């Protein structure tokens, strides 16, 4: 029996979680819970894992909190109201209208059409 050790912990967007689950399922580690989680992630995914990682990287200049960047890359909001409803979680920073527009522009570059 092999042991699993957690070396690091990070917030990840839905599409990255889906990619990791795909790898687990393909290696034979499937269960009903994993399959249902995969199906859910597949239904809400708005960009692929690579694009989501790029969104997170580009957002790091604007949004300092990793969890907020992961949520933005998961949900892919495209209006200022949607972005503001997520950014409210970051109580350490006030975002300008320019910041919000930059976030929307970054997300729109990578979102699935």
Curated annotation (Swiss-Prot):
One annotated Gene Ontology cellular component of this protein: cytoplasm
UniProt cross-references to InterPro entries, sorted A to Z: HRDC-like_sf, HRDC_dom_sf, Rpb4/RPC9, Rpo4
Keywords assigned: Cytoplasm, DNA-directed RNA polymerase, Nucleotidyltransferase, Transcription, Transferase
Annotated Gene3D superfamilies: 6.10.140.930, HRDC domain
Main location: cytoplasm
Protein EC: 2.7.7.6
Subcellular localization(s) per the UniProt record: Cytoplasm
Gene Ontology molecular function: any one: DNA-directed RNA polymerase activity
Record's function text: DNA-dependent RNA polymerase (RNAP) catalyzes the transcription of DNA into RNA using the four ribonucleoside triphosphates as substrates. This subunit is less well bound than the others.
Similarity remark: Belongs to the eukaryotic RPB4 RNA polymerase subunit family.
Subunit structure: Part of the 13-subunit RNA polymerase complex. Forms a stalk with Rpo7 that extends from the main structure.
HAMAP family for the chain: RNApol_arch_Rpo4 (MF_00864)
Protein name in UniProt: DNA-directed RNA polymerase subunit Rpo4
Organism field: Saccharolobus solfataricus (strain ATCC 35092 / DSM 1617 / JCM 11322 / P2)
Gene: rpo4
